[in-house]
Amino acid sequence: MNISALAVSGVLLLFAQTSFSAGMEKSSQTIMPFLESGNYAELGIAQLKADISGQVQNQDSLAQIGISDFSTGNLVNKNYLFITGAIKLQLRPDLSVGFLFDKPFGTDLDYRYRPETVIGPLDIESVRVKFDSNNISIPVGYQPDAHWNFFAGPVLQTLKGEVELGGQNYYLLNGYTSDLKQDFSMGWLAGLSYQIPEIAFRTSLSYRSPVKHTFDVQEQLPIATPVTLTGKTTVKTPQSVNFDIQTAVSTTDLIYASLRWVEWKDFYVQPPTFQEVLNAYSVYDSSLKNVSMIQYNQNQLSAKAGLIHKWNSDWSTAHELSWDSGTDDSLSTLNPSNGYLGIGGGLIYHYNEKIFLAAGLHYIRFRKASRQKSTDSNVIASLSKAANNHAIIYGFKTGFHF
């Protein structure tokens, strides 16, 4: 087959590692760089520009005090950056080790609804939620022959977060803040891969364990004299399964696909003082018992499929379709969408047989989340309507064998 492994890597590794999926997922946590032949290194950077908005609730009441603009404005940081890197070393013909870096989980929501009223600007509602993670996976692989690769290894992960709530819509939680100090914890991964190099065929199945973080959390209560309380809270990032497959269909064309499952249903963020305040006031409003800061109703399933065409020894192009199921959560500022459909394209330049440069662009159209269901737990900052939200991801990646 004339289609080279570098042509495959250029686009697969560019799109596979950048994501704007369900929950807080920001990476597909692919194992693909580790499956490259020989010694290999890569570095990638991508940026997301999102336009995500909706309309607030209680519009009739707001109109009575002269408010006519019910739009939330853009709910997310317009310039979300993705960084990935990998080094894979073939220590012996039958033994390899990899170091894979990504930022798999995170969110950057900064929303403030402060419309003009008959008495001037009024703080109705504001939400600031920011989570950030760093992940280093260290798979060690055993290759008994040219086809099989069995691998496992530790996953080192840090996670931190902050939440701020404000505005009259929050009543007793107006002014609440929570700071989850950065925590380091460990998980593990394992999997296997089968390949037939002569026809560029490769398939892999990998599993990542959940990672349990125990945070030192600092919460500030919105009372006459602000009180800061410290405590502990636990957050478990989700376990996941990835399946990837690719094969050449001619001397110049290769098709590929991937499927990913993530267990978001067991993920939640509920600091202790936040819960205690809700419990205390639930005597007056029983619905407060079910309020969750961050929680997801369903697990996530996502898929990608694409075609790579090799034009000559220097240039290849790719086209890709993507789909994400979402987590079926109610419409809110924290969940303005429920999955997406996407389409992308990429261009790969082969500097020589060992080095490639790749650039790509991916357009995402988000599906609208539904308004709150009676079976859901109450959510923070519910919305009455979602806009036609979308995002664009563009990125660059370089890789080389050595």
Task: Give the role of each language-model region.
Residues 22-25, 53-56, 60-64, 82, ...:
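Outer-membrane beta-barrel porins/channels
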